[in-house]
Amino acid sequence: MDLQVSDSLKIIQSVINQRKQKYEENGFFLIFWSVLIMLAGVLQFVMLITNYYPKQSGFVWLILMALGFFYSLWIKVKSTKRKKAEKSYNDWTDWLWFVAGINAIIAFLIPWSIFDSFLTAFLIIYLPFTFVTLTMALQMKMKLWIVACLLAFIIIYAVQFISFSQEVFLPLVSSLMAGLLFLIPGIQFHLDYKKRSNVR
């Protein structure tokens, strides 16, 4: 059976639409994580500039990220139980998110290791997430998200040249990165999902 060019394009478009629909429904997770990261960044920044337990300000990240992880895991387990009857395909982008997340967890330890560098941790945390989001943005042909990812790459490398006295602003830059990588597409997915829901 020979496929015509138009048939091939239809198949490709249907795969892209399935992926978009999956993430539109999960647009909640992108928004949830972006808000959580932005909140952690702003809280740590406020603790640092007001000198309110500055050495313990990193625990804000530990607490909020752990809560976010367990909440996400709980939601994922609940949704998996509901979809158990359906045959679900194994999405390779889920594995990319998983690897980037594990990488971020390990990178939290860098400032307390022999590297002793928050800038290195920032690079190691956000670079994989930026690659994952850019991969998805290119696959889904979402121009706004592609631009946000490219801007994130520029910020990641620009941050490496910040002088040590300016590291106090890294939590705010983390908030900006969360907005670029997660909040923008999350809102876009949510709006697309609402449009589709109203049309049906």
Locate predicted features.
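Membrane-interface helix-boundary signature
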Residues: 19, 23-26, 51-54, 115, ...
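N-terminal juxtamembrane cytosolic/stromal segments of multi-pass membrane proteins
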Residues: 1-27
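Structural signature of hydrophobic alpha-helical transmembrane segments
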Residues: 56-67, 112-127, 172, 176
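Membrane-proximal helix-loop-helix units in multi-pass membrane proteins
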Residues: 89-150
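Terminal transmembrane helical module of multi-pass membrane proteins
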Residues: 132-200
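Amphipathic, well-ordered alpha-helical segments in soluble domains
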Residues: 8, 38-41, 179
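Short helix-capping/hinge motifs at transmembrane helix termini and TM-loop junctions
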Residues: 47-51, 114-115, 140, 162-164
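Selected alpha-helical membrane-embedding segments in polytopic membrane proteins
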Residues: 21-109
